[in-house]
Amino acid sequence: MEINPINYIAGINLKSLKKSTEPEPQKSVDKSENLIKELDKMSMINNVNIGKKDYELNLSMEELEKRTHKDYLTTKKMLAVDAPEYLELEEGDKEALKHLVKAAVVLDKVNMQLDNPNNLPFKEYLEAEISKGNEQAKLTKILFDAQKGVCSLDRESNMIELIKGVSERPGKGVYPQDLEKDEFHAILIKMLKDGKVDDVAKILNQRSVVERVGNELVATDYVDKFKDDFAYMASELEKAAETSTNADFNEFLILQAKALRTADPMLDAYADKKWATLQDTPLEFTITRENYSDELTETVVENPELKALLDENGIIPVAKDFLGGRVGIINKKGTDAILGVKNYLPLMAHNMPFKDDYIQNISPDKESKQTMVDADLVAVTGDVGEFRACITLAENLPNDDKLSIKELDGGRRNVYHRQIRLITSEDAREKMKKRLAATVNPELHQYYNDEADHWFTVGHENGHSLGPKSGTEGLGKYKSIIEVNKADMISLAMLDVLTEAGMYTPEQRKQIIVTYAADNMMTSKPTLSQAHRVRSVMQNYYFIKEGAMEISPEGILNVDIEKMVPTARKMLEEIIQVQMKGDFSKGEKYVLDNFVWTPEMETMAQNIKKVSKTLNGKVESPLADKLLES
């Protein structure tokens, strides 16, 4: 039986948000509609939807049947109920795993509210309609559960809106739905001129939900906003710590539980610092905090008057965190293989461009504060479990904006997701072969190796710990695009250094280069909100311009292997210069100059789509579902 995580959680009551499906009374239509409109305006203050009594489903049955078909909706399966990784755990860790899953699923409910205020009430509406036999609602629910929300881009960069008339907002669910950029800036300017500096600082930090109060905006810390949910999570983490067999892991769980109970960023910092030291633990638990989704906060650097006031008052704007939960079992063999790179991190730091002009998380002459594990996944929830065109392959956390890095001199930790990266079915391998045949010069096929993609990812994640540690906030909405671009180019630019040092063989070097190039080809031009996909277009354009790659008029990729690393080095140098300057206009120019979709890229995209129909994906978590029953 599949357990719905949101409905499972004890104490959750969504009845007050539920949309009635009873027919509207026919009397006084005009008056009631006017009242609804006024209530809608008022509801914008706290992101509560009053609106119409019924939602209108946006996708037709034909479109839903297509998008939920297995050819279009791929599946990533987390650990099975009888997985040996689970069965081999000690009993105390098995018991702890139950509580970790119960804690993690709370973040589905929390993050849906951060994402869009319609998410939870629409979920309730769908469930009510499904109980009446509504097939359109049933198929819509499959997509809703996959993308964990009402709005999502697919792999072809089409915005999929499940509710008619409901679109994604730049401020997602962390800002009032009617707040536009110009008004946002004007309110902040007035508040700063009125001396409300602390209030503005809270609005522009990464851990608050912003609401209207009169003509101003007020921020509420996540811990206070979701007090009951976080208290439930804390209780489950404390229960897990009672039976888990690893003392270090238990210490982290207790620290994280404290941080969930009190709105104090330093409590999170202590938990983060401990988490980043975890290396030899049986279990994995993370509250992921990433800020790729918020498109409103960092627009403040685009307004000269507002930017000057922020600088004058020492306020650094940081995009809002969106929250996810990761529960897993550490794979020792995979972890040992990944750990081999740790010895080379100082060498990589030493070979960074302009290394003497900034501070890095990894020091060229000291032991690195970087741990890394390979995890067999039991559950991915909230932000890290969303399948929106793609799904998270690995993470290097905490990010540089977190206090454990800035105030406590803590380290970082890489977690790699085995169930998401591994190609296990023959069907998937056959699709991969067809894609290669349709898009890559046959002479290069010998070098394509899906395991090489994992090693490129290892380089990418460690790349986040290299380069300027701070000072990039002024890049605004381009900061994330430039950062993920930097991480990619570090992975590629360091190949010759690492091959010479013995980490890779010459054959592995070629495999990483060709596999990177083949996998970097896109099915469509993305939107600027898709940082990870924008960087791919930028790189493809840059490498083609430099003669390291070529796409024929027929859409076939050719790679000049020996030009790839020097080209990556050149691009990395340019990226580091942009990051060091931290200037919005320079960052914007760099992105837009290279974010060019050529006719050859479009031909390539059409070739890919002929052999791969996939538009999105979903996650299945059989072991997690079973643990939620117990």
Residue ranges and their predicted role:
Residues M1-E62:
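Low-complexity, intrinsically disordered export/secretion signals at extreme N-termini
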Residues E56-Q256, A271:
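N-terminal helix-rich structural modules
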Residues E90, W455-K469, A487, L492:
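Active-site recognition of the HExxH zinc-binding catalytic motif
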Residues D224-N441, N449:
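Contiguous, non-catalytic segments that form substrate-binding/exosite surfaces or channel walls
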Residues N246, S480-V497:
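An active-site-proximal "capping" alpha-helix that borders the catalytic cofactor pocket
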Residues P468-N485:
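Post-HEXXH active-site segment of zinc metalloproteases
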Residues L492-N594:
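Long, well-structured alpha-helical subdomains associated
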Residues Q577-S630:
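Extended, compositionally biased alpha-helical segments that mediate assembly or anchoring
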